[in-house]
Swiss-Prot record:
One of its GO terms (molecular function) is monooxygenase activity. This is Oxidoreductase claK. InterPro entries: NAD(P)-bd_dom, NAD(P)-bd_dom_sf. Oxidoreductase; part of the gene cluster that mediates the biosynthesis of the bianthraquinone cladofulvin, a conidial pigment not required for virulence but that plays a role in fitness and resistance to environmental stresses including UV light and low-temperature stress. The pathway begins with the synthesis of atrochrysone thioester by the polyketide synthase (PKS) claG. The atrochrysone carboxyl ACP thioesterase claF then breaks the thioester bond and releases the atrochrysone carboxylic acid from claG. Belongs to the avfA family. PANTHER family: FLAVIN REDUCTASE-RELATED, OXIDOREDUCTASE MDPK. It is an enzyme of class 1 (oxidoreductase).
Length: 270
C-alpha cells in the first residue's frame, strides 16, 4: 500500500453519517474508503460518483460475514462505526451487535496482540453515539427537553450504552473515540468545532463527519478514548425536518412498545 495513502473503513455507508463521511473523504485525494453496506445499489444511488472512483471499494454484506468484515478493516487507519437507527425500535441491538462482531474479527486478525500481530497496529474505532446520554456534554440542555429526548430514543440509547461499555472493556488493546453530537441535520457544511465540554446543536452530517475524520487523524491522539461532541461553528445547521414526528413516534415506542409494529419507520433528520 502506498505509504502516502490513508485508508478508512466506513460501517453503515448508506446512512446519513456514513454517506457524509464518504463524501468528505472523496475530497481528500490521498484517502481511500472501504465502504461497508448491506445494499450496494442503494449506496450507488446515494453517491453515484463512487461507481467509477478508484478511491472507494464497496464491501456488500452483513456484519456477521467475518471474512468480508476482516477484508474491509485490514490496513485501515480508522473504522467509523455508523450503524444505528433514528427509530426507537424496542430491543434495538444494532450498535451492540456491530461492536461485538467487529471486536471478534479484530481479535481474529491478531490486533489484540501486544505488537498488533501480523496485520500491524489496530485501527482506531470511532463510534457514533449521542451527547444526550453523556451527563457532562448535555449539562446545558433544559431538563424537560433532556427528559423527553431520553425517552423518545430510549431503546437506541440503551443499545449505545451497552456498546460503549463493551468497547471500553477492550481499551487495554483497542482505541475507541466516542462521538457524541447533539441534534443532527441534513444540511450543507457550515463549520464545526470539537468539544470535550458541551454539545451545541444542530450540526450537519457533513460537519459531523468532518469532525470525526479530524479526530481520527489527530497525530497526537488528543481525542483517543474520550467522549467528544462535534458542534456547529458560528452558524448552526438548519433545524432538521422530521424531528418532531420522530420524537412523537419514539415516545409511543417507549411507553407502548407493542405499537412498534403499527408505526412508521424511517423517522429522523431529512
Amino acid at each position: 500500500m502506498d505509504s502516502k495513502v490513508t485508508t478508512y473503513a466506513v460501517l453503515g455507508s448508506t446512512g446519513n453519517c456514513g454517506s457524509a463521511l464518504i463524501r468528505n473523504l472523496l475530497g481528500k485525494p490521498q484517502s481511500r474508503v472501504h465502504a461497508f453496506c448491506r445494499n450496494k445499489k442503494k449506496l450507488l444511488r446515494l453517491i453515484p460518483e463512487i461507481a467509477d472512483s478508484k478511491q472507494v471499494e464497496v464491501f456488500e454484506g452483513g456484519m456477521q460475514d467475518h471474512d468480508l468484515l476482516a477484508a474491509c478493516i485490514k490496513n485501515t487507519r480508522a473504522v467509523f462505526m455508523c450503524i444505528s437507527t433514528n427509530d426507537n425500535v424496542p430491543g434495538c441491538r444494532l450498535s451492540q451487535d456491530s461492536a461485538i462482531a467487529l471486536v471478534k474479527v479484530m481479535r481474529e486478525l491478531g490486533y489484540d496482540k501486544p505488537d498488533g500481530g501480523p496485520n500491524g497496529p489496530a485501527p482506531k474505532l470511532l463510534l457514533l453515539s449521542s451527547g444526550t446520554i453523556d451527563p457532562h456534554l448535555s449539562k446545558h440542555l433544559p431538563s424537560l427537553l433532556l427528559w423527553i429526548l431520553k425517552r423518545s430514543a430510549s431503546h437506541v440509547y440503551a443499545d449505545l450504552e451497552k456498546a460503549e461499555e463493551f468497547l471500553r472493556a477492550q481499551e487495554s488493546w483497542l482505541t475507541t473515540i466516542y462521538i457524541k453530537p447533539g441534534a443532527l441535520s441534513v444540511d450543507k457544511k457550515r463549520g464545526y468545532e470539537l468539544s470535550l465540554t458541551e454539545q451545541k446543536d444542530p450540526v450537519s452530517y457533513l460537519d459531523l463527519s468532518a469532525g470525526m475524520i479530524e479526530a481520527a487523524d489527530d497525530p497526537e491522539g488528543r481525542w483517543d478514548l474520550k467522549n467528544i461532541s462535534v458542534n456547529c461553528g458560528s452558524t448552526p445547521a438548519g433545524f432538521p425536518d422530521g424531528t418532531i414526528l420522530c420524537i412523537l413516534m419514539g415516545l409511543l415506542r417507549h411507553y407502548f412498545p407493542w405499537t412498534h409494529a403499527y408505526l412508521p419507520m424511517g423517522m429522523g433528520p431529512k
